[in-house]
Amino acid sequence: MGKDEEEMRGEIEERLINEEYKIWKKNTPFLYDLVITHALEWPSLTVEWLPDREEPSGKDYSVQKMILGTHTSESEPNYLMLAQVQLPLDDTESEARQYDDDRSEFGGFGCATGKVQIIQQINHDGEVNRARYMPQNPFIIATKTVNAEVYVFDYSKHPSKPPLDGACNPDLKLRGHSSEGYGLSWSKFKQGHLLSGSDDAQICLWDINATPKNKSLDAQQIFKAHEGVVEDVAWHLRHEYLFGSVGDDQYLLIWDLRSPSASKPVQSVVAHSMEVNCLAFNPFNEWVVATGSTDKTVKLFDLRKLSTALHTFDSHKEEVFQVGWNPKNETILASCCLGRRLMVWDLSRIDEEQTVEDAEDGPPELLFIHGGHTSKISDFSWNPCEDWVISSVAEDNILQIWQMAENIYHDEDDAPGEEPSKAS
């Protein structure tokens, strides 16, 4: 009986998800300026835009690259991948940025093929938990593997099609962890300085400029203070000696490399009531850091007074796994959760007055809910070149590249009552 009930519940949930998706699809033209949906062969647990952008002459699109990975079934090979994406130019005629009903795509060029192409596959041992490029040289990509080591690849030194023997040949293997994890962060100040956090409760720091032995490097420094899994690590974006970490022990820790003790963070706070899964420092305001948690909330903290949160965002209905600041707008933050939703927040709208009707959609700072995914979102990335464009990947193999409609974030001049409703 129990199994039948479980199956029925699963079927009902699937039906609800499909209904929600149909409603989302129908509303896409009103809520978005761009939606590209691409089915990958395997799910990717990671996505990150690369910083370069080209405009081919005579074309109505720009070309950018992004990093993806695979999470295949047991016997299938895994890859670190590079994809090339065509994005319509802003001044493209509106009929060219048309809505493609069959594919629920908005911002196509009258031709749906070839907008996302996998241009390079590099053999990888096991799934790619996370992949991030080095800011000073985007050819260099670090990956979190399932075997505790962190791999470093220079993708310019690898062929576009992987060797058929399936051999994984990273340019460097970074040692120091005893188990896998997800936390990974390159220093924007010190070329080659890489932080990693894992399930072994440790944070490792490497300098990849050091001389390797047999393509292997041991950690330059290991930081131990978390009591349990280190879920995420991040370098501060203004001070080269500061970084933060969060973990299953519910703590947010701030570390200072100038401190004499590697086991003592300079600041610590119990940030959430459950595991803390992610953190992100604000790129404009040196004091502000955001965290996301299994307790379904996103919180803002001020490094000058870490003991109490500045603000709590509590609209998510499931555990929050990723947070990320808009690289061009100081007050814009995005977060995604287990519940298939990616939310975009505007801090400048906190405590704004609302009508009763608007309040039903969520708090004033909840700017937008992206409802295009039908399973858990694994990762997302703000586009560094195209304002307000986000790419997101989910467990059902879907990669989406999207941009909310301009009138949603530029609505200061709207008459009362004309404010666009939030998507969901």
UniProtKB/Swiss-Prot annotation:
Main location: nucleus
Subcellular localization(s) per the UniProt record: Nucleus
Gene Ontology biological process: DNA repair; DNA replication; embryo development ending in seed dormancy; flower development; heterochromatin formation; heterochromatin organization; leaf development; pollen development
GO cellular component: chromatin silencing complex; Cul4-RING E3 ubiquitin ligase complex; DRM complex; nucleus; protein-containing complex
KW Transmembrane helix (keyword) present: no
Residue windows of the WD repeats: 123-163, 176-216, 225-265, 271-311, 315-355, 372-412
Tissue: Ubiquitously expressed. Strongly expressed in floral buds and flowers, the female gametophyte and the sporophytic tissue of the ovules. Also strongly expressed in developing embryos following fertilization.
Key words of the record: Chaperone, Chromatin regulator, Developmental protein, Differentiation, DNA damage, DNA repair, DNA replication, Flowering, Nucleus, Repeat, Repressor, Transcription, Transcription regulation, WD repeat
InterPro entries (UniProt xref): G-protein_beta_WD-40_rep, Histone-bd_RBBP4-like_N, WD40/YVTN_repeat-like_dom_sf, WD40_repeat_CS, WD40_repeat_dom_sf, WD40_rpt, WD_repeat_RBAP46/RBAP48/MSI1
Motif (DWD box): 243-258
Domain notes: The DWD box is required for interaction with DDB1A.
Membership in a protein family: Belongs to the WD repeat RBAP46/RBAP48/MSI1 family.
Quaternary structure (record): Binds directly to helix 1 of the histone fold of histone H4, a region that is not accessible when H4 is in chromatin. Component of the chromatin assembly factor 1 (CAF-1) complex, composed of FAS1, FAS2 and MSI1. Component of the FIS complex which includes at least MEA, FIE, MIS1 and possibly FIS2. Interacts with EMF1.
Function: Core histone-binding subunit that may target chromatin assembly factors, chromatin remodeling factors and histone deacetylases to their histone substrates in a manner that is regulated by nucleosomal DNA. Component of several complexes which regulate chromatin metabolism.
Protein name: Histone-binding protein MSI1
